[in-house]
Amino acid sequence: TYLANNSKEADSKSDANVLISEIVIEGWEEHPEGRKLELAAYDSMSIKPGSIVNNQLLKQDLDAIYASGWFSGVKFKAEDGVLGVKLIVKVVPNPILKQITIQPSNTIITKAFVNQIFDKYYGSTLNLNELQDRISLIKKWYEDRGYSLARVSGPERISDNGFIQLKIDEGIVSEIQIRFIGADEKVRKGKTKEWVIRREL
């Protein structure tokens, strides 16, 4: 029986229908909040025991488990059984969130404020959707203070230790150059004095 065991295979053209007799979630057993994560993976899936599935449905469920935000890795594996196919879902849970740090350390936003934003999430499994929501709050904090160019980015990959570093580029303007563009879109000598324009900035 063909069954996708990763997203690349799930995109293949094989459309064989397969009866799923059992679903087993693996990879959560050693995690402090393992049972919650097992249920989160199962609840994200539309496939249940007794479902007849193909690669398209498997791909949808693979994406849905990722979209829950609790996992940094998901793979499907299949084992043939007497009553159908046993679907094994191997998950890699995100770590328990322990600390958020900001880089560089001399930003105008305080560590205390960042900790306040994340306070209720410390000690719980990191959820990437919640992380993005919190990052949006930090961006809004900057926008509310006139830093419209500020950028906040999360980590490129999640480490196992639960320490997350956010990179903040406050978008501080270091220089302003004034040019006068004519109707022909070429640079011209302006009639307005440059100091008058700078005064209004």
What residue spans do the PLM features occupy?
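Periplasmic polypeptide-binding modules associated with outer-membrane biogenesis and secretion
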Residues: 2-201
